[in-house]
Amino acid sequence: MVSERNRLFTILIALFIVCEAMAVHPKIGLVFGGGGAKGAAEVGVLKVLEEAGVQVDYIAGTSIGSIVGGLYAAGYTAKELETMFQTQEWLSLLTDRKASLSNEPYQTIDGVTYIFGFPVMDRNSNIFGVMKGESVEQMLDSMLSVKGCKNFESLQIPFSCVTADIRAAQEVVISKGSVSKAMRASMSIPGIFKPVKLDDRLLVDGGMLNNLPVDVCRKMGADIVIAIDLQQNEQKPRKQTDLSMLSSLADLLGFGGILEWVTNRPDIEKYLENRQKADIYIHPNLPDADASSFGNKNAARMIQAGVVAAKQQLPELQRALIDK
């Protein structure tokens, strides 16, 4: 009888400890915004969070943020991601450059025209965009395989990848299936990369409609959302393109359409709203960087900018953890 009471008492104590642990630890979500090569700054933020012992429970990412966030969700450390940014031949990967044609000024093979190995025109497709992104997708798939996380279901941290459906003019959040294909879709800048066909959808860069997906991370269950914003130009509410008037985002896929989108930015209201809703807003200072600033020296500089920005917000994060 005494033994039975002791056993029940032990179980109750264990349950109490578990409940206390769950109550003490608010769920932390990490949002990786889009910004091309500037994504290196997000690695700098991760370095600071790791050093501070911050446990991330949910991740949402757009464009380059989907790559950094997805790989972190798979178990890659900030140090490993730093090495990736500083050593990968990003230009060749992203452009599907054919090394065998790198010395050829002009060559056409199977309807695709190459200039010094870079694809510039595809006569076989009626969708604007030349690069397939196959090289970078294969690299990402290999990196995910190393961690045993090729599918969303096997990731170490729950992850949502933001894309945009060019036919329906709708944001599409992917959280199941192939992680590398979702990443490839999320980074497919219209007019440069071909859209990714997934089920009955044609998907492009999620930054078209949601470049800082704080709302997505919140819906995943995050109590505290840390957002990393790579946008450098000050954005203000303005007259926008009414997406409901477009038959699809495909209407924006010509050169003129891309310029119109850049001018009107149909995602601005959502971006500003998400920025305000972030509990911790980290904004690396990258005045001389742009989406194409790849390379070892640029990566090192942007990573350091991420470190500086994250350290500035650490006290705010500590206060948020106490308040929750």
Residue ranges and their predicted role:
Residues M22-T62, G70-K324:
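Patatin-like phospholipase
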